[in-house]
Amino acid sequence: MTVSKSSLSALTLGAIGVVYGDIGTSVLYAVKEVFGSGHVPFTSDNVYGILSIFFWTLTIIVSLKYVTLVLRADNNGEGGLIAMLALASQSVKDKPALRRVLLLVGIFGTCLFYGDGVITPAISVLSAVEGLEVVSPAFNKFVIPLTLLVLFGLFWVQKRGTAGIGKFFGPITVVWFACIAVLGVAQIATHPTVLWAISPYHALSFIWRQPGTSFIILGAVVLCVTGAEALYADLGHFGKKPIRVAWFAVVMPALTLNYFGQGALLLNNPAAVKNPFFLMAPDWALLPLVGLATLATVIASQALISGAFSVTKQVILLGYLPRLKIMHTNVKEVGQIYLPFVNWGLFVTIVLAVMIFKSSSNLASAYGIAVCTDMLITTILTFFVIRYSWKYPLWLCVAATSFFFVVDFAFWASNLLKLFDGGWFPLLIGGAIFILMITWKDGRRLLNDKLRADAIDLNSFLEAVFVSPPVRVEGTAVFLTVEAGTVPNAMLHNLKHNKVLHANNLFVTVHNHEVPWIGMEKRLEIESLGHDCWQVIINYGFKNDPNIPKALQHIKGRGCDLNDMTTSYFLSRDTIVPTIGSGMAQWREKLFSQMHHNASGAADFLRLPNNAVVELGSKIEI
């Protein structure tokens, strides 16, 4: 697809604001954590070596792995771990055991995204507000309250949508990158030889001289690639070219200049290690810089929150979470959604993280394990995509991914050292969500097996009913059923208690597929069952927005004309009764039952009109 120059500029500006906000604010804390750890003495060789490791980490992980390789593995134009998981699992669908392992690995990686979603806003906003301590130590007692206030404001505005202020994200982030580049250049001018650190010689020399220290500091160096996954996750919003142009033309140069500027500052003044980013600025610029940094971290956090909403919706459609209330904050953009449960759940957990760890340095200990695990999983899934989906030779697939796997593994192993210092926190969050997802998936499988075992064949049932047909009333009845070709419980209850049948009857089954989008040309499958009854299958991808009434509008002219005023939707509202020996542990059955009970109603999730829905309940033992 060709992109015009004006469109490319607009998309590149948008990508800078949304895709690179997170990695752009890593300059606030990455260098401080590496040199502030006390593991690295302040010598010119060591500073050059660390800066070189920073530069080549950005080059290998971001420029080569994500921007060059991973961006190519799009799923119908979409990116992100779920899109790659769907692509990888489809490529090995003839290997069911391997497919199940990949699904579990991919879903676990998705769960770790939520752990990262807690740490990243906390460490970003906290590190920005900590700049006040550089202005005056008297501000120290205000850092945590101000951080919590900023975070509360950020989460509170989510329900109102960000369409109005979102247009400012790109320009503000461009100003941020320009600012950090200028700060870096000013310091490099005082010590220009620091630019020699671009040579990989300095990184390799440092690793050769201090292998143990090198391994330890990788756990802090990984902070410089926070948000690298966003490059791939936002592929569908901006496209490959704008993301690549933004990285190579703006983001990478600005980050390099700032990191090298901080290195130059430390060579001139090792005491600046307490907060090298803010100490690069002149005194008169400190307060404005704190304000700009706070804005930049809020924008970075906003992108992550929006990502959490989007990922949760995708996971729900793939059947790994129960339905949650989804509100559309922009009638023109279906992708702009708000999930109250996810929003306030994230907020409470982030507040907990801030209160537990209390500083960006302590939070840095919690960061890394979840992200590095996701990086490893992305590399593994990429191998299966290029091997089994693209059909590349095995040697080429191994060559393309093994190098990145070794690099990712080195960072992951180093971050394991931080497990008991805080790394447990995102793992605990991700592990808890993984248990919820797997329990829901297994519970739904058991429930569907039970429904299938007790199901009545729809065609046979209709033949029997119309031997002595019930009273027909005007209008259309839409019965939602999990399994196509079976009689929905709602219809059985309707016939039993009301003893009537509508003039038109649609038996609707929703199928969610492991592809991002399904267009309208493949949305509906319709089969006439006679007696003014139809079987309708509605197909959605995991990025589609389920809307049953809108989908059924396309049935007009195909044998059945719908009138919104005379259409009723019949749903079954099942109550789960856990039993012993069903295939899941008793505690998981109870957990599934509670999740099922608290799930948002199908009517809201499928956008059914409130005044046209009839819910009929039943109890099901599993």
UniProtKB/Swiss-Prot annotation:
A GO cellular-component term linked to this record: plasma membrane
Membrane topology: Multi-pass membrane protein
Compartment list: Cell inner membrane
Record field: catalytic activity: K(+)(in) + H(+)(in) = K(+)(out) + H(+)(out)
Domain of life: Bacteria
Molecular function terms from GO: potassium ion transmembrane transporter activity; symporter activity
InterPro entries: K+_transporter, K_trans_C, K_trans_N, Kup
Ranges that cross the membrane: 11-31, 50-70, 101-121, 137-157, 168-188, 215-235, 247-267, 285-305, 337-357, 366-386, 393-413, 419-439
A Pfam family this chain is assigned to: K_trans_C
Keywords, comma-separated and alphabetical: Cell inner membrane, Cell membrane, Ion transport, Membrane, Potassium, Potassium transport, Symport, Transmembrane, Transmembrane helix, Transport
Function according to Swiss-Prot or TrEMBL: Transport of potassium into the cell. Likely operates as a K(+):H(+) symporter.
Family to which this protein belongs: Belongs to the HAK/KUP transporter (TC 2.A.72) family.
Listed name of the protein: Probable potassium transport system protein Kup 1
Organism expressing this protein natively: Albidiferax ferrireducens (strain ATCC BAA-621 / DSM 15236 / T118) (Rhodoferax ferrireducens)
